[in-house]
Amino acid sequence: MACTTCELCNVRCCLDLPIEPSWLKLRGRLIHEEGRLTFPPFEIMRASLHKELNIWAAYRADRPRWMPEDKQGMLPERAEVAYFPGCTASYVEHDIAQATACLLTKAGVEFTYLGHDEACCGIPMLVSGLWDTWEEILRHNVEAMKARGVKTVVTSCPACWLVWHTLYPEWAAKLGIDYHFEAKHWSEVVADQIAAGKMAFDHALDMKVTWHDSCHMGRAGKIYEAPRQVIQAIPGVELVEMEHNRQEAHCCGSVLSLVADPPAAARIGNLRLQEATATGAEALIASCPCCEVQLRVSADKSGCNLPIIDLAHLACDAAGLQHPDPTSYALAMWGVFEGMINLLKPEAMAGFMASLLPEMIEAMPQPFRGMMHMVKASPGPLRDGMIAMMKPVMPFLFPRLLPGMMPKVMPAMLAGVGERIAMPTEMEEQMPDLLPAAMDNLMPKMLPAVIPHFMPYMEAYLKGQPARGTARS
């Protein structure tokens, strides 16, 4: 279930079966019809979306921060074209949003921007099966665009493009929502202006590059030529293709794989980096913020020195407009995210819960709290016998006790998360809201996978033995 959503299976299937769309539907049905658990990190994202409209646990008010101060307040409130940067370009890789806005201006496009009214496009919620939140986000963004008189939505992120071009209209039809928007990737807009002789780049860059076709814009959207036309219009730049390109292009390893299985995602990313390096290119050019994060993370972990450069960033360099390299900040933010992913694995969560055993026992209602104290204080043979009697009962009892215990344990849990994960200030400030909301959804469904790992810790604690792996870092 934790695939990359790259759709290569659809291309390779000799029976032309809709494999990836079927997986997409299955995830939603498993969660909404069978009450299954989604990939745990998506519950943190969902809590952030509900509170601040983004997946990075940043503040909604800070979404426009990517925009240079001299540009803020300069865009029209209403326009037929809107620029939709998406979460990662807005909060992590600012160069993408800054460069795209500059290129649209250079192309003569008058555009508006939702600012702090922009929400995540919602695709993380859709692919993880959290369709109720996906629908909320869809309605929010569509209404926000309508309020500004928008007819065309221009995106940086290929996933955002896929949402506005394909997924929103499909769901709007099912939900009875009026939907009239055209969607374009910025490279299509700029390529059209270049072809019409209305736009050109005047700074030669003198470099050899290769191009990574994003799955959501490539295989899913068939946008192959516009990005290449932009690259080929830059003086001094030589484009060399990777072995697997266009429809056959290999995925970077992001989306569900990156969240559910980071080591597998890193291996997939390394394969793409090796293919790029084999071309002799001096840089790998991409146009997907999430691809770029994933490729940067894979390069960092594998020791690959090939620079990952966003296409808009490259094009702005060719226009004489410089933007900062986001690599260091992107790696730091991914480190926070990966820390949360690792903490939410069942075995890690069991160890984390074990570190909170004193608080958990004190949070138990009577008579269970007293029973735990009695077991811990009993002499060896009697204690061991009582523990043996408890062990088969706890998997059934613990899920019933936990909802009442969580509010009392939450302060210690928040402190433990803060000790384990070096969060940015805005994320740490929001954790008292985000973590309880996520745990309310997670724990009832996650406990069956956690309890087998947790019980040995609990038994060791009651016997007065050190429970390895429970120390707070």
Predicted feature residues:
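Iron-sulfur-cluster electron-transfer modules
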Residues: 1-172, 332-348, 352-360
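Helix N-cap/beta->alpha junction signal
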Residues: 156-159, 187, 288
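Redox- and metal-dependent alpha/beta enzyme cores, enriched for Fe-S-associated oxidoreductases
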Residues: 195-199, 209, 214-263, 351
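Conserved hydrophobic helix-helix packing surfaces used for dimerization/oligomerization
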Residues: 81-83, 209, 284
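Amphipathic, rod-like alpha-helical scaffolds used for oligomerization/assembly
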Residues: 344, 348-470
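A polyampholytic, Gly/Pro-enriched intrinsically disordered region
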Residues: 132-137, 198-213, 258-268, 325-344
